[in-house]
């Protein structure tokens, strides 16, 4: 039972391999995107047009709490990924440094973890649903790129033609 609790993705102790890290971040993104979509349907009167550009204080507090939760869980996943690389969790603060965060993210996504036990425990096996989620993510990224690149090229051509006229 305690192994299951320690292996929970919501706990900072333990390790995340690359696939687990991507899958849990994707799951987090889906959760918060779903919250946003539900909120948009429940609170249609809270749009900027109906509020004359002013946001109500309770809504602002709720949004700050939601963003705070998203950042908190992202840092938890980041710490677990750093543990897989046998690095201290304090390195996760690099994610808040502009430009460094881009290189740091690439490092975490591309660098393999340690196959043996390290200071932070044994390697965590990637669960089947995590692998499935990563494959889904890659398929969606390829499909999105297949539509986005030609659409962007079309936009650039139209913008150049408009400048010439």
Regions found by a protein language model. Give the residues of each.
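Hydrophobic alpha-helical segments
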Residues: 52-103
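Hydrophobic alpha-helical membrane-insertion segments
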Residues: 28-34, 95-100
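Membrane-interface extramembranous regions at the lipid-water interface
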Residues: 1-28, 73-90, 104-134, 154, ...
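Structural signal for membrane-spanning alpha-helices in multi-pass inner-membrane proteins
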Residues: 36, 40, 95, 105-108
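Membrane-helix interface segments in multi-pass membrane proteins
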Residues: 31-74, 129-137, 141-165
């Amino acid at each position: 039972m305690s192994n299951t609790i320690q292996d929970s993705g919501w706990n900072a102790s333990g390790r995340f391999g690359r696939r687990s890290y991507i899958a849990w971040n994707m799951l987090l993104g889906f959760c918060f995107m779903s919250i946003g979509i539900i909120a948009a349907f429940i609170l249609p009167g809270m749009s900027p047009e109906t509020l004359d550009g002013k946001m109500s204080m309770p809504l602002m507090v709720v949004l700050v709490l939601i963003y705070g939760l998203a950042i908190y869980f992202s840092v938890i996943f980041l710490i677990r990924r750093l543990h897989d690389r046998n690095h201290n969790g304090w390195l996760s603060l690099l994610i808040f440094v502009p430009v460094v965060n881009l290189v740091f993210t690439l490092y975490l996504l591309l660098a393999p973890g340690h196959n043996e036990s390290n200071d932070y425990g044994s390697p965590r096996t990637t669960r089947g649903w995590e692998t499935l989620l990563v494959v889904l993510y890659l398929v969606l990224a390829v499909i999105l790129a297949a539509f986005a690149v030609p659409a962007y090229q079309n936009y650039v051509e139209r913008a150049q033609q408009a400048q010439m006229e």
